[in-house]
């Protein structure tokens, strides 16, 4: 009797395993987009846009960041798209379409490392932070191995394709990433350009205050960046989870 029960259990178990195996074969295999990177996570040549927001102040203002350097401001009735272009060796390159882009996120900071054969062996690094007390953000560009090439960074800010966003994500209604994109023919396009210093630190800063994009003296912009980084670092180190 016991042997009969054991045989029955074995047969049922084998059938169930077969069913699970067949079911698993029919499931679409998914590849992880992001991978652990220190206390953050990163991806290489990702395609997700406006999926990681940076918050600073207590207002609803936020900066949406992407797997590549294209950004958007979320501010009720005042949304903006922000993108950058590098001009080097007589050519212009949209930073969101370079050949190699590693994007990393850690505790309120988004970082990018970019390379492109068209501009030689140069490496362009970018990090962006939200301001802690005001509605805005700051970008820090750093250039390496560009030699004596003149590097110009151009920032562009304009309205987003959609002006009024849905606020019902909790019930499944939300706007797709294309809502944050720039329209084909922007009506409120503003362009700001800066030249990468060839003496001293090859760094260049941009800032957006509310919806105004600007650049300025590196010494002043650097202080704003460092203050935002200090605030972020202090906040991040106040609570640490180890798994």
Q: Where on the chain are the PLM-derived regions?
A:
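Bacterial Sec-dependent N-terminal signal peptides
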Residues: 1-25, 141
């Amino acid at each position: 009797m016991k042997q009969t029960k054991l045989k029955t259990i074995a047969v049922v178990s084998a059938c169930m395993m077969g069913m699970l195996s067949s079911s698993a074969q029919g499931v679409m295999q998914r590849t992880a987009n992001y991978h652990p990177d220190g206390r953050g996570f990163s991806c290489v040549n990702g395609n997700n846009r406006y999926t990681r927001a940076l918050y600073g102040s207590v207002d609803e203002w936020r900066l949406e960041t992407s797997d590549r350097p294209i950004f958007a401001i979320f501010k009720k009735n005042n949304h903006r798209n922000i993108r950058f272009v590098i001009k080097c060796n007589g050519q212009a390159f949209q930073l969101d379409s370079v050949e190699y882009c590693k994007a990393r996120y850690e505790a309120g900071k988004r970082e990018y490392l970019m390379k492109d054969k068209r501009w030689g062996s140069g490496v362009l690094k970018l990090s962006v932070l939200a301001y802690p007390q005001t509605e805005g953000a700051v970008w820090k560009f750093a250039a390496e191995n560009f030699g004596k090439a003149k590097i110009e960074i151009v920032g562009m800010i304009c309205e987003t394709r959609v002006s009024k966003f849905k606020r019902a994500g909790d019930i499944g209604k939300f706007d797709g990433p294309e809502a944050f994109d720039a329209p084909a023919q922007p009506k409120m396009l503003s362009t700001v350009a800066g030249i990468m210093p060839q003496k001293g630190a090859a760094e260049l800063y941009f800032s957006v205050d509310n919806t105004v994009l600007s650049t300025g003296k590196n010494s002043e912009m650097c202080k704003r960046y460092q203050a935002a980084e200090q605030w972020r670092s202090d906040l991040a180190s106040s609570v640490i989870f180890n798994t």
